[in-house]
Amino acid sequence: DNGDLFGTASAYHDHFRSGGRNGCVERYGPGGELLWRVRIGGENYLSHHDVVLLENGNFLAIVWDRVSSDEAIEQGRDPETVAEIGEFWYDGIIEVDPYELEIVWEWSARHHLVQDLDPVKRNYGGVAEHPELIDINTIHRNMRGKITADWTHLNSIDYNPELEQILVSSPHLDEIWIIDHITTPWESMGHAGGRYGKGGDLLYRWGNPANYDRGTEDDQQLFGQHDAQWIPEGLPGAGNILVFNNGGRKRPYSTITEITPPLNADGSYVIDASRAYGPAQPAWEYDPDPPERFFSWFISGVQRLPNGNTLVNQGAGAKLREVTVDGDIVWEYGYQGAGDVPHMLFRANKYPPDHPGILMHTN
C-alpha cells in the first residue's frame, strides 16, 4: 500500500529449462529506486513463478530442488516413470529475510512423500491411508506425452495471516495444497508439530483425489490451474479459494472456480476417513456457454473485486474481462503486447484510483 513494486525478475539458469523460472526477487520504491534484490539460484536450486510479501517484510518464494533420477528412485519413484534427462525436481517453499539475505524458514515436498511400490523404503504405505502425504509416483506428461523432471511445477503461492497457512497450486498434478507455516525447521520436515499438529504434511488438498487414491478420473475438478488464492477479508466470498481453472488435454476449455473449503473452527480441515476432501462442488463458477469460447491452456489469473465481480485474465491471448456473479461481461480489454512479443499475460490486478499505492505516485 505504500507504492512500492514487488515481484520476480529474470536471472535465468540454463540448467532449469521449464516455464516460470526467474531466480531473482526485487522491490522498488515509488520513485523507481531499487530497495533490494535477492538472487535465489544455483546449479541445483532456483526460484520460480511466484512470490508473496509477508507483513514482517520477509517474502515467501517457490523453489525447485533438483536431484538425480537415482535419488528419486531411492525415495520410491518407479524407475519406469523417470524423465529421460535423468533428473527429478522437487518443489519447495522458502521464507527469505531480504535485508539479512537469510532463509528463515523452508519446506520441501521431498519430506512429505508416500509410495506403495517398494515395501523396503521408509515412506512405504497405503496412499489412500495418507492423504496428508504426496504419492511420489503420481506422474505428469507434457503436451508431447513425455514424463517431465519438473514433477509438481508449483505456479502460485498465497498466504493467510489469520490461519498462518500457505496455499500453493500444482498444475502438473491438478491440485491445490495448503500447509502450516508455523513450524520449526525440524517440524516442517516431519509429520507432527506446528499450529495444527501435522508438521509440514498437507493440511488440505483439492482438485484431483485420484492422486491419493480416493477418487477416479471422473472426480477430477482442477485442470492445469493457475493463481490459486484466498479471497481477502472484506470482499464478497472472503475466506473462499478462487482459481483460474485452465483446462488442457482432458478439458479444452477454462473456468473460474471458487470453493468453500471445509474449515473447522480451529483452522483445520474436515475429511472423512475414507473419502476425498470436499467440497464436492464449487461454490461458484464462471463457465461461458459454449465453453470453448473461453480457453487459456497456460498462465492466466483471477481477482475478486469489492463490488462482487471478478477480474479474469485469460493469459493466452492477453484478454481481460470483468464478469458478474451471473457471468455477464461488464468490461473487456485486449492487451496488445510490445513489438513481436506474443500476446500473453501471466497475471493482472485491478486497483481503484484511491488505492494508497496509486496516491503515493500522484500526490
Where are the language model's segments positioned?
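Histidine-/acidic-rich catalytic cores in large beta-rich domains
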Residues: 1-363
